[in-house]
Each structure stands twice: as C-alpha cells, then as structure tokens.
C-alpha cells in the first residue's frame, strides 16, 4: 500500500496547530505532535525539516486561512460591524489562530516576523479598503484607516485573549451571542460618521 504523503503532511500540520496553540513554540514537543497525528515523529523532520520550520508552516497556513476566509473589500467595509462579527465567529470557531499569534508576539524581539512583507500587504489591502470607504463617505474619517482597522482586529480578538477579564467585567460566564452583538454594535458606532472617540 502506498504512503499517502499529502494526508500524512496534513495530519502533522493539524496536530502541530493544536500543539503550538496550547504550548507555544518553546513548550511544544515534536513527540506529542507525532503522537497526535498518529505518525512517527521522523516524518516531521522529513516533511518540515525542524521544529522552527514546522511552526512557520503552521503560522503561514493559519494566516492564509483567515485571509481567504474573511476578506475585506471596500463594499464589505461599509458595514464594518458585520466584518467584526465575522472575525469574532472565526476566532470562536478557531481559537488556535489567535493563540498562535499571541505566542508569536511573546517571542518577538523586534526583528522581522514570519512572512512579514506578505502579511503587511494583506493588512495594507484591508486598510486601503477602509480608506476608500472613508473617502466615499460611508465611514468616519476622524480615525486614520490604520487605526480603525487595528481597533476592529483588537476588539474582535480580545474576547478570546483574556476570557478571565470577560468574566470579571461582565460578571459571569461568557455569552457568545451577547458578546458578538455588543461587538457589532460597538464597531458600527465607532465607524459611523461622527462616531469616533
């Protein structure tokens, strides 16, 4: 029976997403990734070279996934609250992504990030969409488009970054539907003409 390299590689990537999200780069173990994937750990070295390259591939794959799943065009930017709701939904369904970014941030020493030029271009296209929408009069111009985009990213992710703060501030366990509705309302208010803080 032939070895299914594509399936094995994907199983390793899937297992690595969970391992790196749970433990970060330093805490992740190649042995656990192999065990989770049901594959000999030597396959990791065969397909990815080393742990650093595997982490890079995991992060790159997850970044591509969110970029293609939730694009932002000028038309979509007209309802920035809806976009924020989509981000919230994504983070809720795939919490590993935001955890991977936080682990990457904890390791940041000021040098270039993985695929930084490509990521900068992706962010830039979204900022440009917001700028076009602002020029068309559909969004508040009191904030720079970069500030507005960054605020939306932060607002959508923070619920999942510090769930303990959500419990303490809101006085109880998480209520995803209420959180999502609040986020959408807040971003719409922030983005509407005259809504800047």
Map each language-model feature to its residues.
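N-terminal intrinsically disordered/low-complexity leader segments
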Residues: 1-7, 197
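Amphipathic alpha-helical linker/stalk segments
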Residues: 56-83, 117, 123-126
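C-terminal peripheral helix-coil segments that are non-catalytic and often amphipathic
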Residues: 89-93, 124-136, 154-197
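Short coil/turn segments at alpha/beta junctions that flank glycine-rich nucleotide-binding fingerprints
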Residues: 22-26, 94, 136
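Amphipathic alpha-helical packing segments from all-alpha helical-bundle domains
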Residues: 67-70, 110-136, 146-147, 178-181
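Helix-turn-helix
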Residues: 11, 15, 19-53, 57
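Amphipathic alpha-helical segments that line or abut small-molecule/effector binding pockets
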Residues: 14, 77-106, 120, 146-150, ...
